C-alpha cells in the first residue's frame, strides 16, 4: 500500500528543516527524525490544504543495498506497517517524520526491521501502545 500524497514529505527545504529542528531517536538499524510541522515551508507546495497533516518520508541509503528493487521493497514494507498502525490511532499530531535506514547486513531480515521500526515509533511517542 503506497503512502497517500497528502502524507508524503517533499522538497529540499522541508528536509533541511527536519535535519536542523528535529528530535532524533536512534536504533541499531535506523534513525527517526521528528519535527513539528511548519506550514511556512510548505506554502509553495500544491497540497497547501494538507499543511497540518502528519507527513512521512523513508530514506534508504545505497549503502543498504545497491539494488533499487531491494531498497524499494524495504521502503514499502515500512510504509505498509506504518499505515496499518497509524490508521488505528485517531490522535494524529501535525508532525513530520523522516526515517533513515543505516547500512547493515540485518536489513535483509524483515522481522528485525519491523521490530525496531515499531520500537522507535513507540519510543518517539507517535503511536500509543
From Swiss-Prot:
It catalyses: Endonucleolytic cleavage of RNA, removing 5'-extranucleotides from tRNA precursor. Its EC number is 3.1.26.5. Pfam families: Ribonuclease_P (PF00825). It is an enzyme of class 3 (hydrolase). InterPro entries: Ribosomal_Su5_D2-typ_SF, Ribsml_uS5_D2-typ_fold_subgr, RNase_P. GO terms for biological process: tRNA 5'-leader removal. Coiled coil: none annotated. GO terms for molecular function: 3'-tRNA processing endoribonuclease activity; ribonuclease P activity; tRNA binding. GO terms for cellular component: ribonuclease P complex. Keywords: Endonuclease, Hydrolase, Nuclease, RNA-binding, tRNA processing. The keyword tRNA processing applies. It comes from the Bacteria. RNaseP catalyzes the removal of the 5'-leader sequence from pre-tRNA to produce the mature 5'-terminus. It can also cleave other RNA substrates such as 4.5S RNA. The protein component plays an auxiliary but essential role in vivo by binding to the 5'-leader sequence and broadening the substrate specificity of the ribozyme. Consists of a catalytic RNA component (M1 or rnpB) and a protein subunit. Belongs to the RnpA family. This is Ribonuclease P protein component. The lineage of its organism: Bacteria, Bacillati, Cyanobacteriota, Cyanophyceae, Synechococcales. The gene is rnpA.
Amino acid at each position: 500500500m503506497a503512502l497517500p500524497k497528502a502524507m508524503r514529505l517533499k522538497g529540499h527545504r522541508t528536509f533541511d528543516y527536519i535535519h536542523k529542528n528535529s528530535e532524533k531517536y536512534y536504533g541499531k538499524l535506523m534513525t527517526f527524525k521528528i519535527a513539528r510541522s511548519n506550514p511556512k515551508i510548505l506554502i509553495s507546495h500544491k497540497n497547501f490544504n494538507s499543511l497540518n497533516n502528519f507527513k512521512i518520508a523513508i530514506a534508504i541509503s545505497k549503502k543498504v543495498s545497491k539494488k533499487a528493487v531491494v531498497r524499494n521493497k524495504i521502503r514499502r514494507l515500512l510504509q505498509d506497517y506504518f499505515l496499518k498502525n497509524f490508521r488505528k490511532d485517531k490522535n494524529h499530531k501535525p508532525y513530520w517524520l523522516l526515517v533513515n535506514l543505516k547500512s547493515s547486513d540485518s536489513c535483509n531480515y524483515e522481522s528485525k526491521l519491523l521490530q525496531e521500526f515499531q520500537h522507535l515509533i513507540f519510543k518517539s511517542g507517535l503511536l500509543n501502545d
